[in-house]
Swiss-Prot record:
Residue numbers binding Mn(2+): 150, 152, 231
Residues where 1-deoxy-D-xylulose 5-phosphate binds: 125, 151-152, 186, 209, 222, 227-228, 231
Residues bound to NADPH: 10-13, 36, 38, 124, 126, 215
Pathway the protein acts in: Isoprenoid biosynthesis; isopentenyl diphosphate biosynthesis via DXP pathway; isopentenyl diphosphate from 1-deoxy-D-xylulose 5-phosphate: step 1/6
UniProt EC number: 1.1.1.267
Protein species of origin: Pectobacterium carotovorum subsp. carotovorum (strain PC1)
Keyword Metal-binding listed: yes
Protein name: 1-deoxy-D-xylulose 5-phosphate reductoisomerase
Keyword line: Isoprene biosynthesis, Manganese, Metal-binding, NADP, Oxidoreductase
Taxonomic lineage from the root: Bacteria, Pseudomonadati, Pseudomonadota, Gammaproteobacteria, Enterobacterales
Catalytic activity: 2-C-methyl-D-erythritol 4-phosphate + NADP(+) = 1-deoxy-D-xylulose 5-phosphate + NADPH + H(+)
Length: 398
């Protein structure tokens, strides 16, 4: 029986993780849950899974949860704040930590799990986008094991030889016969929209992803393909890949989640229904296999799989991310932070869809900060980029 802490339990990955746990009650148990401000959903989760601990982002939410749990006679101990999330990530007796807190808020709790030597199921992109080298060094020093949750990275992981799986971030791709990692993306809801019409796209249109059910922020990132850009950066660190060993292609059906091309001409791919429960179940049970609850793939119903090269005029954020990755960790950190500010402004209808890339580009152009040597350095770059993006927003405000 594996004991888990779920960081970000009320988000879409957290909810899917709990669904997999519920489908396999003889294999997994919840020791601790951590979330932001969604008291209502956290209450339901605590009553269903009876964790020893739960944490909320602030004392107001924690107090509300505490009072409501007491009314039900639930014994879950409720904590508050970022340190509480870090403590729950490093709990004694916890085997696995699902790192699914979105954004820079997930950095320190994820790092706490790594330092504690846990098996870390990594769904927080920002950990590697902003702290790639720091995180991979910490993994090596602590003996922690990273298992990727993003459907693309999980697909790549499954398509790689075991020697690389066991030494993520350090094993040589070329020495293990790998020629190239092929990252696939659907192209989002605006794949066929005229580029001239993109400026008029609304938040609701951007969030209507054709294949995946996701949160609003990541849905917008899918529409701009910034999500694929962040995944590109993450894959470079996770699989120790050079720019020459990476390729991004559009695959509208989202059936092939990514591929690995080998020196002998073989290409290994992982296929499945677009359901996050599949990669979650794979990582939780690794190296075994368990029921995920995901629908089986019906090849006859799919009919055909198609592929396209990405159009960087349509997806300038993808190009920005690739360029930032080649520039360094300071640039990827700044880009990630600027993008969070720009997407939040777009979701509130303060700027146009095409302004997201413009704001991101301006922040990168203003960047003069050196490469980070610590998490504090990363957080400083993150704060600087957020302030710079907020200032730039005033020029685009509608």
């Amino acid at each position: 029986m594996k004991q888990l802490t779920i960081l970000g339990s009320t988000g879409s990955i957290g909810v899917s993780s709990l669904a997999v746990i519920k489908a396999n009650p003889d294999k997994f148990a919840v020791r601790a849950l951590s979330a932001g401000y969604n008291v209502k959903l956290m209450l339901e989760q605590c009553l269903t899974f009876q964790p020893a601990y739960a944490s909320m982002a602030d004392e107001v939410s924690a107090t509300a949860l505490r009072q409501q749990l007491a009314e039900y006679g639930c014994k879950t101990e409720v904590l508050a704040g970022e340190q509480a999330a870090c403590d729950l990530a490093a709990l004694d007796g916890v085997d696995q930590v699902m790192a699914a807190i979105v954004g820079a808020a997930g950095l320190l709790p994820t790092l706490a799990a790594i330092h504690a030597g846990k098996q870390v199921l990594l769904a927080n992109k920002e950990s590697l986008v902003t702290c790639g080298r720091l995180f991979m060094d910490a993994v090596a020093q602590s003996g922690a094991q990273l298992l990727p949750i993003d459907s693309e990275h999980n697909a790549i992981f499954q398509s790689l030889p075991e020697q690389i799986q066991r030494q993520l971030g350090y094993a040589s791709l070329s020495q293990n016969g790998v020629e190239r990692i092929i990252l696939t993306g659907s192209g989002g809801p605006f794949r066929e929209t005229a580029v001239s019409a993109l400026a008029d796209m609304t938040p609701d249109q951007a969030c209507a992803h054709p294949n995946w059910s996701m949160g609003r922020k990541i849905s917008v990132d899918s529409a701009t393909m910034m999500n694929k850009g962040l995944e590109y950066i993450e894959a470079r660190w996770l699989f120790n890949a050079s720019a020459e060993q990476m390729e991004v292609i559009i695959h509208p059906q989202s059936v092939i989640h990514s591929m690995v091309r080998y020196r002998d001409g073989s290409v290994l791919a992982q296929l499945g229904s677009p359901d996050m429960r599949t990669p979650i179940a794979h990582a939780m049970a690794y190296p075994e296999r368990v029921t995920s609850g995901a629908k089986a793939l019906d090849f006859c119903q799919i009919g055909a799989l198609t592929f396209l090269a990405p159009d960087y005029a349509r997806y300038p954020c993808l190009q920005l991310a690739i360029d930032a990755c080649n520039q360094g960790q300071s640039a990827t950190t700044a880009l990630n932070a600027a993008n969070e500010i720009a997407v939040a402004a777009f979701l509130q209808s303060q700027i146009r869809f095409t302004d997201i890339a413009a704001v991101n580009r301006h922040v990168i152009e203003q960047l003069t900060l050196p490469e980070p040597d610590s998490v504090d350095d990363v957080l400083y770059i993150d704060r600087w980029a957020r302030q710079a993006a907020t200032q730039i927003l005033t020029h685009y405000a509608r």
